[in-house]
């Protein structure tokens, strides 16, 4: 039996990278019947939130939700997770750059330490854990296909 999870993610920030900035991440799990369940997470004030930190936080949230779901299952099915994001940065981090950065000691091609290393390493660790129990795929989608997660981020930031 195959258990399939589809999770739409988004992150947003107001005041990107400046003192007083606020940020939020959202993950929306879409079920086979078309219904969805959603979660949001406000970003901490330090380090100052950025759009990129919010997008990677959303990926971490999705990976955490997938691992929690797997732990709740009574059986050990083949577990296939697809994480959708409208962030080319987040998708690039998880599908390409993360492997190069890890090999280079978390430095980029210019020899500088990569930005958001803490969150990217956290996402990498969660991805590794999920790979032990199933498959995870990251898919870029256009912004207009991600309206629910985007709205949830904005609502979270409105409440901060």
Could you tell me what each predicted segment is?
Residues 1-53, 64-71, 156-159:
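RNase H-like nuclease fold core
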Residues 16, 61-153:
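RNase H catalytic domain
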Residues 130, 159-160:
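Short secondary-structure junctions and interdomain/linker hinges
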Residues 55, 59:
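Short, conserved alpha-helix that lines the donor NDP-sugar binding/gating region
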